[in-house]
């Protein structure tokens, strides 16, 4: 039996098993030159959307099966959301892959927009605004923290675990970064991506 098991296992590659559904997505951090100064482009999600309506985000979305790479997915979404041709979007390179506490595996890339003639898709984008890059580089974000906790549900077999506590159990916590600008506050996963980009940019600079 060991031989059969060994022959079977040697053909297998590791797969990632998770306790939660993982969504794979990609976003672009777009740079746009305005009056000789670089700005970072943000979108406000349309109120028509089912998920996170009205939230500030970078252009992006789910990675589709026909996307050649996560970078291609991010640029495709950027083109669709901002209403510009793909050839007006230059890939500058990869940032990092962020995994959120709720199971979003997010690949981020930096891009350069070679047109300011943006025609946002109203089905996805309610508003587009820009923030001067230097303003963000000079800012120290406000940092808050959230707990990640678990709680047994009704079908949990307490009878198998004598004395098991039914209360919430805090497992860990994580930092949340807030970047206020005018009437906007950039935070959440978008804030984490922004911080990742700014940290890398400062290292290069």
Where on the chain are the PLM-derived regions?
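N-terminal leader/linker segments that precede catalytic domains of diphosphate-processing enzymes
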Residues: 1-57, 62-94, 98-107, 112-117, ...
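Short, charged, solvent-exposed linker or helix-capping segments at domain edges/interfaces
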Residues: 118-123, 140-141
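Mixed-charge intrinsically disordered linker/loop segments at interdomain junctions
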Residues: 134, 139-140
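Active-site/pore-lining binding-face segments in mid-to-C-terminal subdomains
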Residues: 139, 145, 150
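Flexible glycine-rich active-site/ligand-binding loops centered on an Asp-His dyad
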Residues: 128-130
């Amino acid at each position: 039996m060991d031989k059969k098991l060994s022959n079977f296992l040697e053909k297998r590659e590791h797969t990632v098993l998770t306790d939660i559904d993982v969504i794979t997505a990609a976003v672009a951090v777009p740079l746009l030159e305005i009056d000789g100064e670089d700005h970072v482009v943000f979108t406000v999600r349309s109120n028509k959307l089912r998920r996170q309506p009205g939230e500030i985000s970078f252009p992006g979305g789910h990675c589709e099966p026909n996307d050649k790479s996560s970078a291609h997915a991010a640029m495709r979404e950027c083109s669709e959301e901002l209403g510009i041709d793909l050839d007006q979007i230059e890939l500058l390179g990869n940032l990092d892959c962020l995994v959120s506490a709720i199971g979003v595996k997010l690949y981020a890339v930096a891009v350069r927009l070679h047109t300011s003639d943006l025609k946002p898709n109203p089905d996805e984008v309610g508003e587009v605004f820009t923030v001067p890059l230097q303003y963000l580089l000079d800012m120290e974000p406000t940092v808050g923290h959230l707990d990640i906790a678990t709680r047994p549900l009704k079908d949990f077999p307490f009878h198998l675990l004598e004395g098991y506590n039914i209360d919430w159990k805090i497992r860990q916590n994580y930092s949340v970064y807030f970047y206020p600008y005018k009437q906007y506050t950039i935070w959440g996963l978008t804030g984490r991506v922004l911080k990742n980009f700014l940290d890398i940019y400062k290292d290069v600079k």
